[in-house]
Amino acid sequence: MQKRQFLQSALVASIAVYGLPTRAQTVDAAAVVRHYSAQVYAAYQDALAGATDMQTAIKALVDTPSPQSLAAARKTWLAAREWYLQTEAFRFYGGPIDDDKGPEGRINSWPMDESYLDYVVGKPNAGVINDRRVAISTANIIKLNERGGEENISTGWHAIEFLLWGQDLSATGPGDRSFEDYVVGKAANADRRRAYLTTVTGLLVADLNYLVKAWQPGAKNYRAKFEQGDLESVRKMIMGLGSLSRGELAGERLEVAMNTQDQEDEHSCFSDNTHRDVVGDTQGIENVWLGRYKRPDGNVLQGASLKALVAGKNPSLADKVSQQIAQSVANASAIQAPFDREIVGSKDAPGRIRIQKTIDSLVQQSKDLTEAAAVLGITKLAQAK
């Protein structure tokens, strides 16, 4: 999880624009904000549905541990992540996900000190799970999250990921935790590991349900207030996209890993799913910009978009931003698995070149988004206190 807010306000360098400019469409800020709200609601619904499917598979694992039930639980974690990642474009403006009471810190905290939660190589008795003095409850695991340090992670996607895969000790693949870690009599504290996995998964589902309710239509909730914001809400939308582009994704998740070349700075290191994390975030940004979201059943939610709003002022700029965002998605999609092999080597190593291209595109798109905000009369992208 990103603790600091990164805000981008640089001038935009000129780039070539391919094709004819977008024809200006008649949309206003209110329409864009209303459609965004519908899009956020749908995306959180899908993230919740994916997590609920994972919860079902995890129940099957703890009830009947086997290679098959462990593989099925891992598969549902990977599938659910695809939908959650696209919601990260709704962060960084003090909305329900990450305001003072928001659950983001419980949902997606990283990097994680594995030994805070469970055993690791050389420390067979490490972690909360192996400390029988600590009662396993929802309240307790919330209190334990980040206690004593930001890497002391006890909740969320990455805690679940570690409990499903274990440490990633391979240079070519993900972690390989045995299903026997959940078999009483086969592994120490298997009963507590089962209870912990069940509890932490239930908390994730509850937190996602909280976000769905915050964006539910026709209720006295955050969405109702957001839809009254017009241009101020548009400002928040653009701030979320720009902050995710530059500070979080290009910065914390890619530049840091490139600089250290350390597996510990990989976002989803246990499952080797980091390459998909990058794609999901870039896709989420594009979803918001285009006002388009493809749901798991194939249905497409389409409506008034930021692109159309900007095109009403400057069609060429709207096309420029669209092309840059599409380039970021394409560059992210070219990153190969495992990510921890992509980041190592010299400057001209193929993997490092692929990641650097993604970083460069994200940095440029954050600048372009700043220019797009300016043509709408938005010049202050810092989060209001």
Regions found by a protein language model. Give the residues of each.
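Mature extracytoplasmic or organellar-lumen-exposed domains after removal of signal/transit peptides
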Residues: 26-385
